[in-house]
Amino acid sequence: MHRSLTLSMIIIAFTAGLSCKKTSTPQDEAEHEAINGVDLVFKVGGATVATFTAEDPDGDGGNPPTRIDRITLQPGQSYTTEVVLRNIVNGTSKVVTSSVSSQAVHHEFYYLPTGVAVNISKTDKDANGYPLGLNATWTTTTSGTGTLLFKLMHKPRIKGPNDDPSKGHSDLSVSFPMTIQ
């Protein structure tokens, strides 16, 4: 009798443990505000020397972007950069960078140059020590013309230290024309 009572208590405890399992939505899955504007702010010696902007007020699909600046940099120069994310609604722009930085462990920015001689190194990390990319150092070498694909990837629970730019799903993707001269 004692043995069957103990076994019954174990089964009840195990079943109760399963039935109390929570199915809440984790904080890391929280939606951030829509991003339909981005500013890349370039500094030399701490002073802002240029800001390049892309805006697509109606978001993906619909109308084409209303603005994509050409990134123009000098050869043989090192820049520090900062990303400013914006949500544009009815002509009003609201900075939403903190919405993404507060969820840094689930996001990563990618800078993918083509046809231009620039080395881009992310200088900030998330709480797990993985690259984020809101801040970066850009070092140009020789003159040239090409493009820079700028991407923000959302990767809840899958972000790693050296992820491929296609891992996760895209929150933002802009192809900036670029010139080093």
Q: Where do the language-model regions lie?
A:
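Hydrophobic helical h-region of N-terminal Sec-dependent signal peptides
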Residues: 10-14
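Bacterial N-terminal signal peptides that target proteins for export
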Residues: 1-8
